[in-house]
From Swiss-Prot:
Enzymatic class: hydrolase
GO annotation, biological process: diaminopimelate biosynthetic process; lysine biosynthetic process via diaminopimelate
Catalytic reaction annotation: N-acetyl-(2S,6S)-2,6-diaminopimelate + H2O = (2S,6S)-2,6-diaminopimelate + acetate
Database matches in CDD domains: M20_Acy1_YkuR-like
Name used for this protein in its record: N-acetyldiaminopimelate deacetylase
Function summary: Catalyzes the conversion of N-acetyl-diaminopimelate to diaminopimelate and acetate.
KW Amino-acid biosynthesis (keyword) present: yes
NCBIfam families reported for this sequence: amidohydrolases
InterPro entries documented for this protein: AcetylDAP_deacetylase, Amidohydrolase, Bact_exopeptidase_dim_dom, Peptidase_M20, Peptidase_M20_dimer
Similarity section: Belongs to the peptidase M20A family. N-acetyldiaminopimelate deacetylase subfamily.
Keywords from the UniProt entry: Amino-acid biosynthesis, Diaminopimelate biosynthesis, Hydrolase, Lysine biosynthesis
EC number: 3.5.1.47
Length: 377
């Protein structure tokens, strides 16, 4: 029989019940049940929508250190074949938030039993994948009352081996924006295309034109990505489609590039309206702020990891990944780092299986870091 640590077991429990943004009711209850099993003398627990705040009072606090873990899953049908695979059809923890939660609970458990001088604030945040839980959580009355002096978060990285962390000072993750474009023309019989305005053709033309933006409208020394991940159009093979919907994402390493990309998208869409005699509506959906690591705190963290732990530390490059933790970092000094979990499949893949050995390594590492930071003069 397989022997696993308590927090690996927790991860497997949570992996079975992935839930989408602001629908994490089972997840919230599971977390609350566990938190309520801990010594309560120094804990103050409050809920916010489907999220949770847990404050651990220090022995003689001079500051509050925040730690954020996201809790939502993705609308992906799992293909791992694991015995603890998702029990929710069409939903999966394909971005490692089950790992994030189990690590947070492990660290919380230690400090519930072994308080340090400073206060700790654990933030279990819903809806990271969308529509975005960090910004409204940051603006909540609870956060205003308990606002930490610094804040930390991690994200699993399938490409790095267990025992590795990766981060950098300054910009770590990109600015991101959702992109939805609806095209409305005139449907008709497939035999009479001259009497209709075909939105399949219009959509295909627009997708091709959008890909020219990065090549011809963004500074080559800057970076941008435009991806159309989904196109919906038509009802049957012999009817010309009256409507088409494009769904995608924009990612840039600067606000200026994001604004330039959006201006060009709007110009191209106007051109498609004229060329294909259709109506178009653009919706940018949710936009996530860049993740910008506080240079001083990040340098200090890297030096701690290199000199006080056995973790392998990599100073990585910035990534085009999007993370709404950026909103918290825009108001609170802190940083985010990658945690190696050594999986052949990447984030958002239906076969993602993080190496669970990373969980206890991360718990021990963060306990060491917070103990050091939380007792520092």
């Amino acid at each position: 029989m397989e022997t696993i640590s308590p927090f690996v077991a927790i991860r497997r429990d949570l992996h079975k019940i992935p839930e989408l943004g602001f629908q994490e009711f089972k997840t919230q209850q599971y977390l609350l049940n566990y938190i309520q099993s801990l010594p309560q003398e120094r804990l103050d627990v409050r809920t916010w929508k489907t999220g949770i705040f847990v404050k651990v009072s220090g022995t003689a606090p001079r500051k509050t250190i925040g730690y954020r873990a996201d809790i939502d899953g993705l609308p992906i049908s799992e293909e791992t074949g694991l015995p603890y695979r998702s029990e929710h059809a069409g939903q999966m923890h394909a971005c490692g938030h089950d790992v994030h939660m189990s690590i947070a609970l492990g660290v919380l458990t230690h400090f519930a039993h072994n308080p340090i001088r400073d206060d700790l604030l654990f933030i279990f945040q819903p809806a990271e994948e969308g529509p975005g839980g960090a910004k409204p959580m940051l603006e909540s009355d609870i956060m205003r009352e308990w606002k930490p002096d610094m804040i930390v978060a991690l994200h699993i990285a399938p490409e790095y081996p267990v025992g590795t962390i990766a981060t950098k000072e300054g910009l770590l993750f990109a600015n991101t924006s959702e992109l939805f474009i609806d095209l409305k023309g005139k449907g008709g019989h497939a035999a009479f295309p001259h009497l209709a305005n075909d939105m399949v053709v219009a959509a295909c033309a627009l997708v091709t034109q959008l890909q020219s933006i990065v090549a011809r409208n963004v500074d080559p020394l800057d970076s941008a990505v435009i991806t159309i991940g989904k196109i919906t159009s038509g009802t049957v093979q012999n009817v010309i489609a009256e409507h088409a919907r494009l769904e995608g994402t924009i990612r840039t390493l600067s606000i200026d590039a994001m604004q330039a990309v959006k201006r060009r998208i709007e110009a191209l869409v106007r051109g498609v309206e004229v060329a294909y005699e259709c109506e178009a509506v653009i919706d940018y959906g949710a936009m996530y702020h860049e993740v910008y690591n506080n240079p001083a705190l990040t340098t200090e963290f890297i030096q701690f990891a290199e000199t006080h732990t056995d973790m392998n530390v990599i100073r990585c490059k910035e990534a085009m990944t999007g993370e709404d933790f950026g909103y918290m970092l825009a108001e609170i000094p802190g940083f985010m780092f990658w945690l190696g979990v050594d999986s052949p499949y990447g984030l958002h893949h239906a076969k993602l299986v993080p190496n669970e050995a990373a969980i206890d390594r991360a718990i021990a590492f963060l306990i060491s870091y917070f103990s050091w930071k939380g007792n520092m003069e």
